[in-house]
């Protein structure tokens, strides 16, 4: 297992040349992101806020993204017990930063309101508030709701990853194990979210990406024997020589992992079979999981030079993890997801 560089002091994320000053990982947003420091074309800058809330029976995902040449605002509702999901997205041409997403996840508001839909992610009274509405979300049915996120852990996964191309980077924070409460109305159905059962993750991303990428990402949040617990795992893009994004969350603290491998089954022709059991292993032997899928939120889009092929697979993990102090904890039927996404963007 190779050594990973932990960032421990606050400093600007980017130098005068637009490159990362200090690649590595951190436990909070120590590197300071300023959009004005980026030297790339506004067409190439990608900024997004993504929230996922679930109790393992239903799920809600909300996205506001400004990808330079294209804005993407998306709502997903997933019903794992009934084995269906609905994702409806609205695209905006050439936002070029006009969405004005905050330069930190710790303050500010991410908001969008267009014909037939609106979303707002903001801070109020020490909590994160998510409000959303979309007409004709599923057929003629609208969706709307308000969700409050609390109990944010002391530490989060933060990583500054360079690409080998100058001026290209990805700055990312994952805040797992937040508790969620609120309500969702979809058509004539109402779903109550209670903080003893629902957990949330924030995927906060800012950067300049190269054109063609494939990434693997997995995440889970919940409780293990009454202790807030989860993980973030992933790889596939950028130069990760300084650090990986693989961590365990336990009791509000991070336990750093080495490299994690996603073993997705394939058929005799080499095509991936996403709904068959997966296996996850790590080079430090601290993360071993068998994954049983229950629902594949798949999406494919190809338009000219733009392509997105997504498989976000939800299911249950069984295996074991090892904390920094050597404590081995068994994990059984722990709900989360793992995905493979290819983008040309």
Where do the language-model regions lie?
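Structured soluble/peripheral alpha/beta segments that form catalytic or ligand/cofactor-binding pockets
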Residues: 1-345
């Amino acid at each position: 297992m190779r050594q990973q560089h932990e960032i421990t002091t606050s400093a600007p994320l980017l130098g005068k040349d637009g490159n990362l000053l200090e690649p590595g990982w951190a436990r909070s947003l120590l590197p300071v992101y300023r959009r004005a420091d980026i030297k790339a074309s506004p067409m190439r800058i990608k900024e997004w806020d993504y929230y996922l809330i679930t109790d393992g029976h239903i799920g809600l995902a909300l996205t506001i993204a400004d990808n330079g040449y294209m804005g993407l605002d998306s709502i997903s509702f997933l019903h794992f017990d009934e084995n269906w999901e609905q994702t409806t997205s609205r695209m905006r041409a050439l936002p070029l930063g006009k969405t004005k997403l905050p330069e930190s996840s710790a303050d500010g508001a991410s908001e969008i309101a267009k014909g037939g839909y609106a979303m707002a992610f903001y801070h109020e009274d020490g909590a994160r508030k998510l409000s959303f509405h979309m007409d004709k979300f599923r057929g003629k049915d609208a969706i709307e709701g308000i969700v409050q996120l609390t109990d944010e852990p002391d530490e989060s996964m933060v990583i500054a990853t360079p690409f080998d191309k100058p001026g290209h980077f990805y700055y990312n924070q994952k805040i797992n194990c937040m508790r969620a409460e609120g309500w969702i109305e979809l058509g004539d159905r109402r779903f109550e979210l209670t903080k003893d059962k629902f957990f949330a993750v924030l995927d906060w991303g800012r950067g300049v990406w190269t054109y063609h990428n494939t990434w693997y990402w997995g995440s889970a949040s919940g409780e293990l024997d009454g202790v807030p617990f989860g993980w973030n795992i992933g790889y596939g893009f950028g130069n990760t020589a300084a650090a990986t994004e693989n961590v365990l969350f336990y009791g509000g603290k991070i336990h750093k992992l080495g490299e994690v491998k996603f073993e997705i089954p394939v058929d005799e022709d080499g095509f991936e079979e996403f709904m068959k059991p997966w296996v996850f292993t790590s080079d430090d032997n601290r993360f071993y999981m068998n994954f049983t899928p229950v629902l594949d939120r798949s999406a494919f889009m190809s338009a000219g030079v733009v392509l997105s092929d997504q498989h976000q697979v939800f299911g249950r993990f069984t295996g074991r993890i090892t904390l920094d102090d050597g404590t081995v904890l068994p994990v059984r039927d722990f709900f989360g997801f793992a995905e493979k996404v290819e983008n040309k963007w």
